[in-house]
């Protein structure tokens, strides 16, 4: 069966749901696809279709990132439903990296919770530029004053992490009631879609820069070869173009023999799109998550760099104790962790939680990088710092 061509008519925007576990992120994702499919066409998705990876069933919490698509009046959205549970923050980092904007879901019954804060902080770290808030479960709160207090609390929390808390749209709704086809609550989902259209500007795609795609996953398709998936960070890739696989191992040249998006074939992939790229003559075991595909010669792998780092406070889920020269955490770049060691500046004996420091980092495996690349510092499965590459050394 030949695959249909993907129609590019409306501008394409990447969004995702973030927020505390059980506040209704997946229910909201289902409600959006159902309400908007009815209004603007598209395929509605049920809750359990979105909550669809095997681990999720066992624990009743979202682990993997689910992708859905929907149309609004003026745009086409690709939407990731991000994991809510603290154990899966690593996945959230990869999910949040794919957002032109995020929908922060906060249950009106609870108000902001620990993971609400953690996800806002992560959004700040991984560069989510815009947040729209959906205050969920408002059907369960009769007290208008309580709703206002929760709203104030959300705005203050956003401002604390340098988002414009006073300007951010907050929509009061009920995802479950909208799924149950209650017209009052359906309208709230439509309101949300209009706020997404109006508040999140169409991103300035870095389409003219050299092609770069951080690899998220690798598949082997019998008879066709190896496919890598990820979101194109910049530039474009056309079928037939030569590209390089960079980072972790030695740099290898290959050729793009196919581009797919949402199971439809494209002639080229563009910045901002989640795509699968078919690679000529590349074995499944030669490629891994954490590498990048890029235009030949446009980016190099490096292991040593100077960085500007913020070390999280204990209250933010960071370390409880200082660290010293030679500290060896994991450095999380784009889609993967790499172990590295830290060299502090002369005169800096130790780094306390809450400090902002310059440090030299030496990685055990090379990573494709430019100045300005952001990373998270992690240990024992939790984020303990956020940084940016200020100067590449080697």
UniProtKB/Swiss-Prot annotation:
Residues 136-139 are annotated as: G4. Residues 10-204 form the tr-type G domain. Keywords: Cytoplasm, Elongation factor, GTP-binding, Hydrolase, Magnesium, Metal-binding, Nucleotide-binding, Protein biosynthesis. Residues 60-64 are annotated as: G2. Its EC number is 3.6.5.3. GO terms for molecular function: GTP binding; GTPase activity; guanosine tetraphosphate binding; translation elongation factor activity. Residues 19-26 are annotated as: G1. It catalyses: GTP + H2O = GDP + phosphate + H(+). Transmembrane segments: none annotated. Monomer. This is Elongation factor Tu. The gene is tuf.
